[in-house]
Amino acid sequence: KFMNLPSITANRVADSISKAFGLGNVQNSTILEAILDAYAEAGITRDSSTWTRPAPTMQRVVDKYLEGDVKKDTVYSVFRMLQDYQIFTNDTNNCVTMFEWLKSVQVIDLTLYEDNIKKLIVSLVLDVFYAEMKQLKGSDQKDGFRELRTMILVDEAHQFMKMKFNSLRKIISEGRMFG
């Protein structure tokens, strides 16, 4: 599927990080490169036959970047923060699809995190949610009512709207058709 193209995922994630932390184009490009390098290291390329391989975790991207000879700039600071907060796992056995995860009620308590970390987590969850919904066909309709597959609630969503996260805007405008 086209949505599995590494550059699509890398762009989504880099965009979320950049917007959450208020980064510019140069920093966005650096993050994008780090993600694409991790995909290449995992043997995942533009060739769709490689897309069944385990994708690199975001923690792997962060660790790999910080292990390198990098200048201590804004991207370094962001990745250090992500490493310190231990938001991501490096164990692919702990990773599930968004739909598997949402088979029951999930609550993510972000009260202890700094605002930019909260924004990043919400944005990444919504990115994955939207990408997986997009891969499904539209939900069934019966007697004028559309099937409700999943519900996602973002408390204080107005704080995220001003960040112009692409996935939140797309979910608001297109989400109904996916159920």
Stretches with model-predicted labels:
Residues 1-177:
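P-loop NTPase motor domains
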